[in-house]
Structures are given as structure tokens and as C-alpha cells.
């Protein structure tokens, strides 16, 4: 977990820091002339009011799955905590291929305008003609059925197609042009600990991934099995 200001990297103890540390980071960013901040807002941070008073131009939900029940107790309480983010956002980007989030959209639980993304479900921004191998994904990025952009993603796994859809929708919401979105997605390289293919010199592939929840592990195994030519151990 790290914080970046330009090319400078700072270690972080939490995905969403406590308020004192967080506002100190924002102050440092402002002093450096930063105009756009991209951050992860955890359910814990929302429940503990770590980001109270902030207003987001746009926010996103990538998925919702079983996690942190030791803290929240039930899936409904966990979802309620995550939905607090919509109260602080001018608009939301939501993956409606996730059945929990699709239901929340149908029930009107987001208190702001919603843009949807997906592969299987009808969505405002979606991917089609998806091809996946062990090195990456090729797909057609479609915006509101008006224009389409071919994307060559250099990280593998169908879940990274979903991540790309969310990133594209966020950028589109704040006025980034389509060519810049494509170039940004295609510039992404392997993230350490996220389906990271290790160079071990062995006749088989070794993959490192941080997957720590049932949903995350399922996604990793599905991604590996899509391209594996032999047994997955």
C-alpha cells in the first residue's frame, strides 16, 4: 500500500489513512500543485468517518463480496457501510454484473446519478469481443453504444477487464478524451502481488497474487485456468 505524489512514493499503513495523516497528504499534494486525486476508500474508512466532509466528483464500486465480516458482522451492514460513499459523490460508477450492486441500483440505494459498467449485463460502458491469454486481454471498449475503442491490456484476467471498464468510466465522467483513456489503459503493467508472473527459470509458470477473500481467490483461479495449458496447483 503506497501513496504517490507525481513520481514520488510514500509508504502507507492503511489503504485509507486516518484523518490526520490523510489531510496531511492532501495538504502536501496541494502544495505540489496536484489537481486530481485518485484514492481507495474502504468500508472501514467510511464507517469510521475517516473521509467525512470530502466531496468526490465521481466514485466507483468495482464489486461486492464476502469480506470484513469480522468487523461488520453481516453482508447487509457491510453493504450499508460501502453505500455511504454515494452520499459524498456527485455521481457513481457501478459494475452491474455484480448481482448485489445491480440490485442496489434497481432499489435506488445510490443517492446520486449512476453510470453502469459490465460485460454480461446491459450497461452504459461495456466490453465485447474479449480475448484473454497469460500476458493480457484484448477487447472492444464501448461507450454508451456511441463509439468503440480497441484496447490491448497488458495485464491478464477477466477481472482486469472489469477494472479497465471502471477506470474508463471514471475518466469519461471527468472529461478525459477517448484516446487518452485507451493509451492510459494500455500503459498499465503488472502490479506487484496481483497475478504477478514470476521469473523463476522453471519449466512451469509461478504466479503471485494477494487474493485474501473467497471472491478474490475465485477470480484469480478463474483467470489462471482460462489460459493454463496444464494442471493448476
Regions found by a protein language model. Name each.
Residues 190-193, 214-233:
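Active-site beta-alpha connecting loops in nucleotide-dependent enzymes
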Residues 10-42:
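Conserved nucleotide-sensing/catalytic segment adjacent to the nucleotide-binding pocket
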Residues 30-39, 47, 51, 55-205, ...:
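Acidic, Mg2+-coordinating active-site environments of NTP-dependent enzymes
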Residues 43-53, 215-224:
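Switch II of P-loop NTPase G domains
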Amino acid at each position: 500500500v503506497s501513496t504517490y505524489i507525481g513520481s514520488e512514493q510514500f509508504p502507507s499503513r492503511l489503504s485509507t489513512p486516518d484523518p490526520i495523516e490523510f489531510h496531511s497528504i492532501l495538504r502536501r499534494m496541494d502544495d505540489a500543485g496536484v489537481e486530481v486525486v485518485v484514492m481507495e476508500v474502504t468500508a472501514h474508512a467510511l464507517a469510521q468517518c475517516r473521509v467525512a466532509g470530502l466531496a468526490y466528483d465521481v466514485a466507483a464500486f468495482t464489486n461486492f463480496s464476502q469480506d470484513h465480516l469480522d468487523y461488520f458482522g453481516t453482508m447487509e451492514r457491510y453493504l450499508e457501510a460501502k453505500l455511504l460513499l454515494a452520499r459524498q459523490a456527485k455521481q457513481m460508477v457501478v459494475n452491474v454484473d455484480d448481482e448485489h450492486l445491480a440490485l442496489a441500483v434497481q432499489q435506488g440505494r445510490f443517492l446520486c446519478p449512476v453510470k453502469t459498467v459490465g460485460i454480461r449485463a446491459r450497461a452504459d460502458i461495456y466490453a465485447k469481443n474479449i480475448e484473454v491469454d497469460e500476458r493480457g486481454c484484448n477487447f472492444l471498449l464501448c461507450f454508451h453504444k456511441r463509439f468503440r475503442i480497441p484496447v490491448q491490456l497488458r495485464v491478464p484476467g477477466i477481472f482486469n477487464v472489469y477494472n479497465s471498464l471502471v477506470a474508463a468510466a471514471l475518466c469519461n465522467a471527468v472529461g478525459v478524451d477517448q484516446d487518452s483513456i485507451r493509451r492510459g489503459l494500455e500503459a498499465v503493467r503488472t502490479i506487484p502481488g496481483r497475478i504477478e508472473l514470476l521469473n523463476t527459470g522453471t519449466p512451469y509458470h509461478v504466479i503471485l497474487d494477494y487474493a485474501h477473500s473467497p471472491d478474490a481467490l475465485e477470480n484469480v483461479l478463474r483467470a489462471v485456468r482460462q489460459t493454463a495449458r496444464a494442471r493448476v496447483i
